[in-house]
Regions:
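Structural recognition of the beta-strand scaffold that forms the well-ordered cores
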Residues: 27-28, 110, 147-150, 195
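C-terminal capping/extension of enzyme domains
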Residues: 123-137, 156-223
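Surface-exposed cleft-lining segments at the edges of enzyme active sites
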Residues: 65-84, 113-129, 198
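Active-site and ligand/interface coordination hotspots across diverse enzymes
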Residues: 1-81, 132-135, 139, 178-186, ...
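Proline-aspartate-enriched helix->loop->beta-strand connector
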Residues: 136-153
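Short, solvent-exposed loop/turn segments at secondary-structure junctions
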Residues: 31-36, 114-118, 153-157, 198-202
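Signature of the catalytic double-stranded beta-helix
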Residues: 76-99
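Beta-strand-turn-beta hairpins that frame and shape the catalytic cleft
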Residues: 21-26, 97, 101-107, 181-194
């Protein structure tokens, strides 16, 4: 972790992020990264839900070190691996902006909300901390996105419901609770916050068409 930073994970930034999607800079925020190396001697400490700090193992994790990799760069590694959830999200973008579908990650930035490796596939409320929200705001100030797409319901209280920077919660029903806006100190423009189900959930498919419709509005794209 860098000095005076709440953030552990370094966001992935696509090479055309500044160009964006239809001229809008888009930051995608997932829930958490998990570790399944249960036999690793570092596992219990690295994924401790009490400590919530994987940084001591950033460059010494046995699994990552043998590949010359660092834990903090997991957002980039996850994009390179193109896990099923990421493929499903790309499918959504395909439905919205067809010409960008094959290389959508080149045009967006990505990170996860929780700032340590969790010990389970699912993200639970007790994994979250104030540090994660501080890291989220830190990332917004750094990347200055026009749009934030937040995956999942576990983080929604932090990202939206209890977020003091949301300026128009009263208008959420107008978009069936998909769209609101943030005004963060240090950023001149307001940020559109788009909250949807996590691509790994069954609700993702059940809500797919409606989600695509509102996402199309957010990026001002017309088929």
């Amino acid at each position: 972790m860098t000095s005076q930073s709440s953030r552990f994970f370094v966001p992935f930034k696509g090479k055309h992020y500044e160009t964006g999607i239809n001229g809008k800079k888009v930051l995608v925020v997932g829930a958490s990264f998990y570790c399944d190396k249960y036999d690793c001697p570092c596992f219990s400490d690295c994924t401790s839900r009490d400590k919530k700090d994987s940084s001591p193992y950033n460059s010494t994790c046995p699994e990552y070190a043998k590949h010359g990799a660092e834990l903090r760069n997991e957002p980039t590694y996850a994009i390179e691996e193109n896990y099923p959830a990421y493929q499903r999200f790309s499918q959504m973008i395909c439905d919205v902006v067809e010409e960008r579908a094959n290389n959508i990650w080149d045009f967006v930035a990505f990170t996860n909300y929780v700032q340590f490796f969790v010990p389970t596939k699912n993200t639970y409320k007790d994994y979250l901390s104030d540090r994660d929200f501080e890291a989220f705001i830190e990332t917004l100030i750094e990347l200055k996105p026009d749009v934030v797409i937040s995956w999942g319901m576990v983080t929604i209280d932090d990202v939206r419901t209890n977020n003091k920077y949301v300026i128009d919660k009263e208008k959420l029903p107008d978009s069936e609770w998909y769209i609101c806006h943030l005004k963060v100190p240090g950023i001149d423009h307001s940020i559109t916050l788009f909250c949807c189900f996590h691509p790994s959930s069954k609700d993702w498919y059940e809500d797919f068409d409606k989600c695509a419709e509102y996402l199309r509005q957010v990026i001002d794209y017309e088929k």
